[in-house]
Amino acid sequence: MPKIISKRKFNILRKTKEEIFSQIVYTKKRNGLHKAAKEYYFKDKDFTIIEDQQDRPDKPEELDTPDIPKPPKPPKGPDQPEEPGQPGGPDDPNSGNKKMPKPDEFVTHRQLQEFKKDLLVELHEIFPTKPELKRVEEKVDVLFELQKAQGEQIRIQGEQIKELKVEQKAQGETLQLILQTLQKMNDRLDKIEGKMDKMESRMDKMETRLDKLESK
C-alpha cells in the first residue's frame, strides 16, 4: 500500500528528491464525491507517495506502546470542586453545559515529532544559523576594513597627485624663466655681433687709408 503524506511533506520531498514519474492510481470517495489521487515515484525511495488533499490523516497512527489502564477518577463532590480551567470548573466557559465540543482531527506523538523535524528543516533552509550569521558578519567586517584601507590609499594618492601638480607648475614656471633668460642672452649676443661687424668694417676702412698713405 503506498504511503500517504501531507501536502507540506510532499512539497519538501519534491524539493529534496528527484521525481521519476507520476500516475493517477485510484479515486476515493469523500462526502459522496469521487476524487482522483496521484501516485508519485521518487529516486532513492523504496516506497511510493500518494498526494493527499488533507494535511493530516483522518485516523491517528497506532502507537506501539502497551495500553496502560487509567485509574478511575474520584467523584467530584461539594468538598472537591473542579479545578480552574477544567470542564465544570470556575473558569470553564461551558459550565452548566455538559456537552463539550470534540476535536475533528487527532495527531499522534509520532506525527508531532515528524512535524517538528520538518519545521526545523524548513527553518534551517530559510533562516541562517548563528555560525552562518557570525561568518557573514566577519566577512562584512573584512570588507569594511578593506574599503577603509582603499579609501585611505585613494586619499594619499590624491594628495600625491596634488603635490605633483604643484611641483609641475613650479617646474613649468622655472622653465619659462630659463627660456626668457636664454632669449635675452640671445638678443644681447646678436647686438654684440652687430657691433663687432661694425668695428671690423671700420678697421677695414682704416687699413685701406693706411695703404693709400704708404703708397704716396
UniProtKB/Swiss-Prot annotation:
Positions with biased composition (Low complexity): 83-93
Gene3D superfamilies reported in the protein's UniProt record: 1.20.5.170, 6.10.250.40
Composition bias, Basic and acidic residues: 47-62
Annotated InterPro entries: DUF16
Top-level taxonomic group: Bacteria
Pro residues: compositionally biased ranges: 68-78
Region (Disordered): 47-104, 194-216
Annotated family: Belongs to the UPF0134 family.
Protein name in the entry: UPF0134 protein MPN_344
Lineage: Bacteria, Bacillati, Mycoplasmatota, Mycoplasmoidales, Mycoplasmoidaceae
